[in-house]
Amino acid sequence: CPDAPEKCAASPSGFQWFDLMDQTPEQVLAKSLVAENKLNKLIDEVKEKNNLSADQIIIGGFSQGCMITLQTGLKRKDKVNSVIGYSGRIIDTEHLSKNINSRPNIILMHGDLDQVVSIDSFLEAKEFFGKNNYEIETKIFKNCEHRIPTEGSSLGLQFIKKHFNT
């Protein structure tokens, strides 16, 4: 799985799809659309190179990666199989609700002690999906900060096995 394309300004050892620091919601949305195009290009390249259909593609991400995979996965006209999201949020619910083109399988997971992306973001995403008649799987990890616990990796693998026909 590829890393995001940019070095992270807030955490030099990490990567980012775009800079979230000191940005207005409009700037974040604009930058997320550029990142979405990059991810769509990658998905299309992987599909072509490996002779895959979209329903053979599962995308996922942590934190900002979750944000981009949710936005991209729901907006693609050729539905990817699934989206796995850890510790993220929906970047712009109004934009996303107006641009939904597909209904992939979705699981969202979040730590209850996350101080980087608040648990409120998880609850807002869960509410968004409910309002838009999505049936999604969710998991809140107790005593978990901004990370993917071992249980989260296991749940992600179980989700893939459940939804991916091999």
Question: Where do the protein language model's features map onto the residues?
Answer:
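Short beta-to-alpha linker loops that shape the active-site pocket of alpha/beta-hydrolase fold enzymes
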Residues: 4-7, 89, 144
